[in-house]
């Protein structure tokens, strides 16, 4: 046992220049942990609350001094004295103190900061890597990355409706080689886009954000880049998409407005559109294919293509075990996106991953569009043997920080390290 002796939070900036929370935890035996909390752009309406100040005279109302004060003045006095190794106890105490289902009292950004920093302090005190402390000595699977190389939707100022077009180097023998493949394709894509006279500026998550004629053109230019880099689509590399359809769903009309393509589709038409894309292109994963509240649409999509495509619930499940349990019961989707700040504690994050695996769902550990240099999610992916990670493109230090941490972990694990590649899609019949 080692008691927590000090907890301190401050306001810092994330990758979009918006304030976020940083927390430091100190223990009596010299343990130290620091955690930086991420934030999202497209957020599910059922996510845990990210507490912002709302004071328009500071950071356009996006300051987090209230959350910082909640750590320093309200949570710290209650958590100081806890055994730093009692992660579940620390997290439960903070949930109980908050007293709301969505952490709306203190803010998930306050609670998560302490949760992650405490884990880091515990690992530091034991002299263990974070992934080993969290996952034990069975933590050895490096995740197959989803690399976001074309940004659209709310992540970019262009006319592409779908939010993310990603590559997954499933044919690589190691994570190191997977990263190399991704980087080479990223640079090949820049060359392809430049040759077409298109913009090669990048979006929030480091992917390119060109104005393209359609969502389908985003797919075809990526396929061209894969070939240009010397790889084979559908063998070495598969495609993945985060549609983020809640962002273009017209609730009043019950229709999906693909403004970039000038199309308004019913749920049935949208599902058929996905089915046609999957038949035509090597797409292995689709995230949030329907609106977060269009559960009938998600069921239709799952029944239509769920046997051969990973269907990931992000806004649909918001890393929440209650939502996930409902989805499992109804046979909706076959995968969950795991975002630590959607739920607000490490304990609840691990519970969601465990529930998914027991039900035969895959789990994809994910970043947010507003990130920092914090690399905790890389350790979480390995600690839980999740098998997949989504942490942006092959540019911007806030994204590369996670990839570099995974390289270090693979190095530390040495011959014990496992990279599953295509095997990480264990529930598909593709």
Curated annotation (Swiss-Prot):
Q: Which reaction does it catalyse?
A: (2R)-2-phosphoglycerate = phosphoenolpyruvate + H2O
What keywords would UniProt list here? Cytoplasm, Glycolysis, Lyase, Magnesium, Metal-binding, Secreted
Class of enzymatic activity (EC top level)? lyase
Q: Which domain of life is it from?
A: Bacteria
Cofactor dependency: Mg(2+)
Give the enzyme's EC designation: 4.2.1.11
Q: Which family does the record assign?
A: Belongs to the enolase family.
What is the official name of this protein in its record?
Answer: Enolase
What broad taxonomic lineage does this protein's source fall under? Bacteria, Bacillati, Bacillota, Bacilli, Bacillales
